[in-house]
Amino acid sequence: MKYFKGISFYIIIFILILVIITFFTATDNPPKMSYSELLTEMKAGNVKSIGLQTDTATIELKKPKENNRTKFVVIVPPDVTSASERFTAALDNKLIEDFHVTQPPQPPWWVSMLPTVGLVIILILIWFFFIQQSQGGGGGNRVMSFGKSRAKMTVDDKKKITFENVAGADEEKEELAEIVEFLKAPKKFVELGARIPKGVLLVGPPGTGKTLLAKAVSGEAGVPFFSISGSDFVEMFVGVGASRVRDLFEQAKKNAPCIVFIDEIDAVGRHRGAGLGGGHDEREQTLNQLLVEMDGFGINEGVIILAATNRPDILDPALLRPGRFDRRVVVGLPDIKGREQILKVHSRGKPLADDVRLDDLARITPGFTGADIENLLNEAALLTARANKKKIGNEEIKEAAFKVMMGPEKKSRVMSEHDKKVTAYHEAGHAIAIKLVSSSQKVDRVSIIPAGMAGGYTASRPQEDKSYHTRSQLIEEIIIALGGRAAEEITMDEVSTGASSDLKKVNQIARNMVTKYGMSEKLGNMIFGNDNDEVFIGRDLAQARNYSDELAAIIDNEVKSIIDNAYQKTVSLLRENIVRLNKLAEVLLEKEKVEGAEFEEIFENAVLEGSSQTPQLEG
């Protein structure tokens, strides 16, 4: 049946029909004769009869010519005297035996309708084609299946993913293992009167493995697994979303026990009534149907819903209540142990050199998700292949880490000497500030080679994972971020635009200290603003702030005070360590890149070598 799918098949059929009709309606047309030849034959008395039809004359000769033919067709030129009068005169003069005028033959009614019917058929085929494309393609049998679910069912996949393929999420796997156990042996739970959760919501940042966990549940359970994206419900026509939800659950009930996985459920499950303008939202109708199917009047036994999102704050409360999504599993960033386990999983099949230690690599990748770590090792493998090496070494992994964090280096970009000096002192200021004030961070590399969107970078890493930050640690973050701007002011007596991203970070930290963390001396243990971390247009747009204009001015003053005090401290620290600042900048201008070990050596030996005067920047 696959050959009967698509618009091409119907176009070929239509062309064949036209060819057949043309073949059967074709007649044996007589050959043509010129008008001058006709006049010659008339003068010779060889014309028996003439039949005139508008500007075409059909003649019959007395004596055959050209393959014994006696009938010919003559096209009468429009610029000659009236052919009818000439032929009538010839008839009167006995030059021809017969002359008659005929009307054009009328084709059969079905022939005259062919162009109209053909146009209608072509338009219908084009309409079918566009509808098919808008519904995701797949052939003519899907043209009218607007309300059918787009869910893909997986049963006994040979390349299935199990919990062994998921690392760094032990607690999350334990939560989901209960679901698998219920599907395999529900009797144990039923005898105790326990009710298995109807739905499990996987929540976490992008790249932490939510979809991978769902695939692992599918592989472990050994039951039919339906997977669909939240955006697949709502498409072109009104009412299609609700219809697809009904069809999805009908299929699931027929294959129970089974699992239904809805990825990015926030595309269809967002808060109702949050649309601007108050108009009806097709998503709301789809969500209402989803709510009914999950926990309504219908019986829905043996169907477990898994869903994933990184925006739980915008989901509708009715969707999150017990009875629908009974359990919420937070898939967070992996800790150092989890990162090491993830590295072991993704390093399978990759030849590693002897100098590679996965525990050290896990230590220098705080904040990396599972997807980041996989990308890191893949980039390292690509760098190794580019260098024609047989094994992935520590050097390639380190370069890949910087590439993932900062972006690829743009060594071909031409920078003026003035810009290089500004960048060198700016990055040196960051590095010196890290060494002076931070006990938890270590400088890995200082570079003035442009990378990503930055003109240079100072890469550092925390010594350990942190769950909380104290006020002094946040002040340290501000001082480190202001190190570049302070170094510019000390060495140039002016500042540049290179600190724009640093200032944005500084202002965000200081404002959070005042409005979210209660770290202001004047305002004390109070928080201000919306409790929601992210604004959801429609729901949050009309919400007013919960403090007065006078209090807003105090908040701004407190933010400014924190930043100003930190900046003065930064300037003071760098002035006290001007020798180290100058030395590091000189080395950066010479080498363009300083690794962590060399930076430590410069920092320790700069004072011993003596002070050098601060160079004046040109331009």
Swiss-Prot record:
CDD domains linked? RecA-like_FtsH
Q: How does it sit in the membrane?
A: Multi-pass membrane protein
Swiss-Prot/TrEMBL cofactor(s):
Zn(2+)
Q: Which GO terms describe its biological process?
A: protein catabolic process; proteolysis
Kindly indicate whether the keyword Signal belongs to this entry. no
Where does the chain cross the membrane? 6-26, 111-131
Give the residues annotated as active site.
427
Summarize where Zn(2+) binds, as residue positions.
426, 430, 502
Provide the primary localization.
membrane
**What PROSITE patterns has UniProt attached to this entry?**
AAA
Topological domain (Cytoplasmic) residues are 1-5, 132-619
Q: Which residues lie on this side of the membrane: Extracellular?
A: 27-110
Q: What is its EC number?
A: 3.4.24.-
Alphabetically, the GO molecular function entries are:
ATP binding; ATP hydrolysis activity; ATP-dependent peptidase activity; metalloendopeptidase activity; zinc ion binding
- How is the co-factor bound, per the entry? Binds 1 zinc ion per subunit.
Function statement: Acts as a processive, ATP-dependent zinc metallopeptidase for both cytoplasmic and membrane proteins. Plays a role in the quality control of integral membrane proteins.
Q: Which NCBIfam families does the UniProt entry name for this protein?
A: FtsH_fam (TIGR01241)
Q: How does it assemble?
A: Homohexamer.
Q: What is this protein called?
A: ATP-dependent zinc metalloprotease FtsH
Q: Which organism is it from?
A: Ruminiclostridium cellulolyticum (strain ATCC 35319 / DSM 5812 / JCM 6584 / H10)
